[in-house]
Amino acid sequence: GRNWMVPEETVYAYLGTAKPKEGNGGILSCAVGNTSYMDVVKNSYYVDKTLLIRDLIDDQFPVILFTRPRRFGKTLALDMLKTFFEKTKEDTSIYFKDKQIWSCGEKYQKMQGAFPVISITFKDAKFSDWASTYVAIKNVIRDEFMRHDELFTSDTLNPAEQDYLSRMQTDELSDVEYAR
């Protein structure tokens, strides 16, 4: 099933902890198929994988390939990274203060919420023909860039880059420009 329920006392006995966590009648769900880090941490049992953040910061590889079978938490791990690094209006550090990454030191805490993050998934771009798939991919890219609308008024981008984003927003870019 998509919503396996594990009795709370069983999990705490296994983990050797008595820390209570509010849930649905004392029973929390296992987050099968949920890819939202914030939702999983708030409402489900979560095995702390935040040391992945430390590993990524320390190793500084230019490219990282996550290879795991289906349903092994790749998308959830990527959403955790996005939640950790992304600069947002709301304070997302609350989702990490009781996790292992927070006890690793100030070096890592300073990086929390410090960067604009582009996170793209094509999981919903499934169509039977290339033309529809291509339009869906363009929309995913455009929507992700538009999430960072603060760039339109910042000094971060030069005028050509601001024009590019403006034309992306109004769907005026050519196929060649999208490939840029």
Where are these regions (language model features)?
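P-loop NTPase motor core
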Residues: 33, 38, 48, 54, ...
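Phosphate-binding P-loop
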Residues: 53-61
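Charged, amphipathic alpha-helical linker segments immediately N-terminal to NTP-binding catalytic cores
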Residues: 23-42
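Hydrophobic residues on the short alpha-helix immediately C-terminal to a glycine-rich phosphate/catalytic loop
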Residues: 14, 56, 80-84
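Walker A/P-loop nucleotide-binding motif
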Residues: 62-80
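Major-groove DNA-recognition helix of helix-turn-helix-type DNA-binding domains
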Residues: 1-5
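A short, Lys/Arg-enriched interface patch at domain edges and termini
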Residues: 9-24
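Mid-core helix/loop region of P-loop NTP-binding domains shared across ATPases and GTPases
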Residues: 148-180
